[in-house]
Design a protein with these regions (language model features):
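Active-site microenvironment for binding and transforming phosphate-containing groups
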Residues: 2-355
Length: 355
């Protein structure tokens, strides 16, 4: 008997022993990608694109400032006479780098490689004027890194190099805190009693790291904030309808949140003709390989609402400003909808004079 044959026999014997032990433990050895695919059971009941429409949020109508800037506000927050806040749209600026057909100048607020820096500065002044009535209101930003880092800011931070973080908080009047988005979820928080405010940028990575929940914890330490005195607004971002992700994102959420799996749906993304007449397309597949017909979609708005609840806020204290950036490319900038070439919106909040 050759040495190769004896090695093959020993390996086969060892594998049989391993299979026996795994069966006794209620497990099974992987047989490779093909076997895993053939035995795969759906993790979710697949939703068709038509069924996903019910998850598509209606966009709120923006307010139009006297300088032409269009922006969105959280319902009920106007009652807080000292509060400045707003969620910008792409409308009402001077930028031409991302201008759609027939559109006027747009309100890009990020220093992107495609836009002129002076134009962006002018756009930021226009937004400050629309929100506060004064274009010179200091604007504090951060260098966003998809983290859970939150910094406390004062007036001097407006002139300093932006800190590496994804959240800002202050109890100092006269400045605007700002986070930038083009699909990620902006969250603004107000302490009505202590007159403190915060802004958070929550992409999926920041959401998994609990930036909103930990940021509210920082407000409690810095300002003595109590959950019952807080109110929050979740601004426009990419909706479940448009936000497809990979299995690794599902794994991250499942590892961090007991409700993580419930944030996902599996969407059938094949076109209606292919779904109705699948045999017509068989010759387009390689033997043994089916098409990737479903994709996971995640609800980041609900994920951050859950974090606000976990931080102690009551459901009635949470406002959701509707609008999917992926669906409404006419109203919002969207990194995904534009193939990666997009401007940036700002969500701003600050403490102004009592009105």
């Amino acid at each position: 008997m050759s040495s190769d044959s004896s090695i093959s026999i020993r390996v086969s014997d060892e594998l049989r022993v391993l299979d026996t032990k795994l069966r006794e433990a209620g497990l099974a050895r992987s047989r490779g990608p093909a076997a895993r695919q053939s035995n795969r059971t759906p993790r979710f009941a697949p939703a068709s694109p038509e069924e996903l429409d019910r998850l598509r949020p209606e966009s709120a109508e923006p307010a139009i400032a006297s300088n032409g800037v269009q922006w969105l506000a959280a319902s009920g927050w106007k009652r807080l006479g000292w509060l400045w806040h707003g969620f910008s749209t792409r409308r009402g600026g001077l930028s031409r780098a991302y201008r759609q057909d027939g559109a006027q100048g747009e309100l890009n607020l990020g220093f992107t490689s495609e836009d002129d820096r002076d134009t962006v500065i002018a756009n930021r002044r226009r937004l400050a004027e629309a929100i506060t009535g004064c274009a010179d209101t200091p604007l504090v930003t951060v260098r966003q890194i998809h983290s859970k880092l939150v910094v406390r800011a004062g007036r001097q931070a407006a002139a300093a190099k932006p800190a590496r973080a994804d959240g800002l908080m202050t109890d100092e009047p006269g400045i605007l805190l700002a986070v930038m988005t083009a699909d990620c979820i902006p969250v603004l928080v107000v302490d009505r009693k202590c007159k403190a405010v915060a802004a958070f940028h929550a992409g999926w990575r920041g959401t998994v790291q609990r930036i909103v929940e930990s940021g509210i914890g920082r407000m409690q330490l810095e300002f003595g904030s109590r959950p019952e005195d807080l109110t929050a607004a979740i601004g426009p971002g990419i909706g479940t309808c448009c936000y497809s992700v990979g299995d690794e994102v599902l794994a991250e959420f499942e590892s961090q949140f007991e409700y993580g799996r419930g944030l996902f749906v599996e969407v059938d993304e094949t076109d209606p003709v292919r779904r109705r007449y699948p045999t017509m397309f068989l010759n387009q597949r390689a033997p043994g390989h089916g098409p990737k017909e479903t994709r996971l979609h995640v609800n980041l708005v609900e994920a951050n609402r859950r974090q606000l609840l976990a931080a102690g806020l009551q459901p009635r204290s949470i406002r959701i400003v509707p609008g999917c950036t992926g669906c409404r490319a006419d109203l919002f900038f969207s990194h995904r909808a534009s193939g990666g070439r997009a401007g940036r919106m700002m969500s701003v909040i600050g403490i102004g004079p009592e009105r």
